[in-house]
């Protein structure tokens, strides 16, 4: 595939940050690391930023505090305790989680530290009850080799996950604290990635190392991949929440495109001679112009006592509407910033539209005294809210004159990104005083290093040799993290080829029809147990899994009985075959064994999932031979 850009020429730099939940107990309390929708109690908090040990306040924390939100926490007695309500000092850390993190460090060619020191990272969006996240470096100076060159892994960290969000309101956020404290491994790379595909290769290698431990959680939300992307002349932008490995190259490509277009806008603004100080914080009340407007949004705001305010953006005409990513413009970036106060903005490059007439646009131009190259942005809301929203627009416009702002952005499903918050500063770390430092004896580190698990690629090779299964099946088993379940099934006596086929082919085929993520390992084990006990045929798996995906509260046995998928006795099978034979006796007399395919098809239509195919074939063959002589 041809590259859209010359990344070397553009000076592309990418760094990865990968977080993965560990499947152990919680990090600082011996409670299960599970999620539940059962709520036993609630409590509330308000959080405030504090200075770091250098006497500085983190800008991202300060911006979150300014929103003035109250945080409500839902808890479950089984899955939390006073540690995670911030009413009791932490215990631990969990030794198993620490050992898994050290294994991962070794697999990434990193050197374990001699002492583990936990730090506090300020987080006041409410996702941590205490207002900080505990994190510790466990290994340093790792590396991943790629065809483009080596990429450094400066740190492997062990930290605690945050609460999960239930509902976000304007002045209130509801969190569930069951996820809080689940151990996370955080792996950071150096910005030595210079091609989008290289980023994917590195992410896959790290993912393989994580999966090798067989101690990482699976499923939605258990892995989070963040990217740090910049080009020469642009800025470092952190992109959060990249869910799929295959999306990494596209997201990087789109961010390069965005930064290039923002630099072009900057150059055009410079050519037009505009400076940041030319954009004044002056609000024009243009409500009168829109008293009889056809715009429902504006009319609704005026009716509820709001105002229509405008700001002047000198020399910005034609640039606010300029596309910077497919379907997104500079105006979209301004709207994203304003969204903490209002639902949307109107700007000159998209008008007349949305019920706003050319007459109204011209009236605003006249009132603001705009020149041919000047632009305006409108907001309709309560006066102070409108002013706050327009202040965000002004701030973003000033940044556009400078080029690309440093910020944290959210990955969108289409590969684009959206503004989240300013880039966090370094002024948000300070020592954790409740957890003593942990000395790692050399003999303990050597024991862990000597007993490292096999990497996924090594496992694939072993499956091909040991179990004689197709390489593509082996690769899918490992990549889809079904390998541990596969080995358990084989150990129980299931033929490797059958176990692999059901786990890969059948489940993959059902993905288009039903939510297969609802099918648990427990469901699968139970279905195979029924098969091993001779209670279902292998043809029944598809039907059972389909029903379990739609109704995960059921058991495999329940589904088999409800759907009539339990195996018939040989006598019952023979009786049904006799009926099929009698219905087609003339064809058999005429064709003899040539009727085998037709009779087999009709018999299996009645017996599929209720009788073993080999038994049916044997009985059909025997009976046709008897008739044909």
Curated annotation (Swiss-Prot):
GO terms assigned for molecular function: aminoacyl-tRNA ligase activity; ATP binding; glutaminyl-tRNA synthase (glutamine-hydrolyzing) activity
Keyword Transmembrane helix: no
Gene3D superfamilies, per database record: 1.10.10.410, GAD-like domain, GatB domain, N-terminal subdomain
Its EC number(s): 6.3.5.-
Keyword annotations: ATP-binding, Ligase, Nucleotide-binding, Protein biosynthesis
Highest taxon in the source lineage: Archaea
Family matches, as InterPro entries: Asn/Gln-tRNA_amidoTrfase_suB/E (IPR017959), Asn/Gln-tRNA_Trfase_suB/E_cat (IPR006075), Asn/Gln_amidotransferase (IPR018027), Asn/Gln_tRNA_amidoTrase-B-like (IPR003789), GAD-like_sf (IPR004115), GAD_dom (IPR029351), GatB_C_1 (IPR042114), GatB_Yqey_C_2 (IPR023168)
Record field: catalytic activity: L-glutamyl-tRNA(Gln) + L-glutamine + ATP + H2O = L-glutaminyl-tRNA(Gln) + L-glutamate + ADP + phosphate + H(+)
GO cellular component, one term: cytoplasm
PROSITE patterns named in the record: GATB
Assembly, per entry: Heterodimer of GatD and GatE.
Summary of the function given for this chain in its UniProt record: Allows the formation of correctly charged Gln-tRNA(Gln) through the transamidation of misacylated Glu-tRNA(Gln) in organisms which lack glutaminyl-tRNA synthetase. The reaction takes place in the presence of glutamine and ATP through an activated gamma-phospho-Glu-tRNA(Gln). The GatDE system is specific for glutamate and does not act on aspartate.
Identification of the protein by name: Glutamyl-tRNA(Gln) amidotransferase subunit E
Gene: gatE
